[in-house]
Amino acid sequence: MSLIEDILQTSSTVTLLGTVLFLLVLYLRSSGSSSEEQGKEPPGPRPLPLLGNMLQLDLKKPYCTLCELSKKYGSIFTVHFGPKKVVVLAGYKTVKQALVNQAEDFGDRDITPVFYDFNQGHGILFANGDSWKEMRRFALTNLRDFGMGKKGSEEKILEEIPYLIEVFEKHEGKAFDTTQSVLYAVSNIISAIVYGSRFEYTDPLFTGMADRAKESIHLTGSASIQMYNMFPWLGPWINNLTRLKKNIADMKMEVIELVRGLKETLNPHMCRGFVDSFLVRKQTLEESGHMDSFYHDDNLVFSVGNLFSAGTDTTGTTLRWGLLLMTKYPHIQDQVQEEISRVIGSRQTLVEDRKNLPYTDAVIHETQRLANIVPMSVPHTTSRDVTFQGYFIKKGTSVIPLLTSVLQDDSEWESPNTFNPSHFLDEQGGFVKRDAFMAFSAGRRVCLGEGLARMELFLFFTSLLQRFRFSPPPGVTEDDLDLTPLLGFTLNPSPHQLCAVSRV
């Protein structure tokens, strides 16, 4: 299907032409007032009126185009997504300087049209200002209280592992697609933390929420939604936007129903999860006369939606990449399983075992680096006028920290384009942290759930490798396994099947 067919359901030539002409006039008028008198802007390819650099961008994998442009224009450059000016930051040193050393300058979120459709400015991921600060602070505090990065989360993951293993065992070594089972296992961890309980993998409410969250993240990265972000007036003709909005509406109704059930059984002295804690805080503020606080229903619903979506797709996708890479490179799988057998034996792996499994830890980190699942991060904006590396960037300018250029920076990684666990090992085989490992981004917008994600990846990965030998389906060789990502907002493995043969 062509991009135009993907975007347009119907068209009114007169309406579209009139709108294009109107926007062209606005563009020409606005382009006359540049910031040249304030300072030199980052270089970049010359944009066309209205279209910007669209003809130079591959909207199906824009991160690849941006990496190529960085070779020509340097580590900071300007590109126009349609009429919208965007500054791209490339390479470890530049991204770190912006996100870490000048965190306040580059710390705001760019609320694109589709992100606004998601949250209307509420919640944790796609918000700015005092509301975002309060919601993020509250989320961090309470997620720690309910186990993020601590013993509580470990117990929840250890409870979930047997359910996932049971699903794998039911296939009896025959080829199957790991997508849904891994998605549901990971989704249950955040469900237990947010709602206070896990769901059965056959629960239609749960599977619907998990499947819709994954589909929505995939659609967000589609070429048609990127076109919508550039030209919001195209919205009525974009199929994927219609599907996204339906998913968002369904998600909101499902969260409202789950919250209603929790509210009916709420015990302020025994909070079961994030939702309970939020409801108690909201009730306390209202009883003290604070009726205009940030603790309102919209912030609750969208914060829960953010935590559920962000806490499932990225971790589940990374785990699936790990299993695929183990199947693709059996000699590396051999070394992981030898280390697990030698150090752990047949007992359950625990988080405290990580320090004694340096090779396995290196493999997990290298999986995250090479999988590069959020290549363009989530866009930022400048919170004020900024002078950065000699260039002037106006307040409110969209900024893309190109994470793929950090995770594959050839000045930081010895073999950036190959799967090489030695990137995280010293000469004695000990684990080595690498500063350029920014799989969770950095600065004010660093991933809220980094600690939880690291724990999930370690415990799920080691438990599965301890229990199963992963191999290609009959008739398929390791060389046949395709590592080309399925394009979307996150980079998923292409559709594939694996065989999980019991080692027990």
Curated annotation (Swiss-Prot):
Cofactor requirement: heme
UniProt-listed GO biological process terms: aflatoxin metabolic process; lauric acid metabolic process; lipid hydroxylation; xenobiotic metabolic process
Residues bound to heme: C447
GO CC terms in record: endoplasmic reticulum membrane
Catalytic activity: an organic molecule + reduced [NADPH--hemoprotein reductase] + O2 = an alcohol + oxidized [NADPH--hemoprotein reductase] + H2O + H(+)
GO molecular function: heme binding; iron ion binding; oxidoreductase activity, acting on paired donors, with incorporation or reduction of molecular oxygen, reduced flavin or flavoprotein as one donor, and incorporation of one atom of oxygen
First-tier enzyme category under EC: oxidoreductase
Signal peptide: none
Record carries keyword Glycosyltransferase: no
Superkingdom classification of source: Eukaryota
Induction cue: Constitutively expressed.
Annotated localization: Endoplasmic reticulum membrane; Microsome membrane
Membrane topology: Peripheral membrane protein
Chief place of localization: endoplasmic reticulum
Gene3D superfamilies cross-referenced by the UniProt entry: Cytochrome P450 (1.10.630.10)
Keyword Oxidoreductase (UniProt): yes
Record note on what altering N372D does: In allele CYP2K1v2
Variant or mutagenesis effect after changing E37G: In allele CYP2K1v2
Keywords from the UniProt entry: Endoplasmic reticulum, Heme, Iron, Membrane, Metal-binding, Microsome, Monooxygenase, Oxidoreductase
EC assignment: 1.14.14.1
UniProt-reported outcome of changing G261S: In allele CYP2K1v2
PANTHER family assigned: CYTOCHROME P450 508A4-RELATED, CYTOCHROME P450, FAMILY 2, SUBFAMILY AC, POLYPEPTIDE 1
Entry similarity comment: Belongs to the cytochrome P450 family.
Name this protein carries in UniProt: Cytochrome P450 2K1
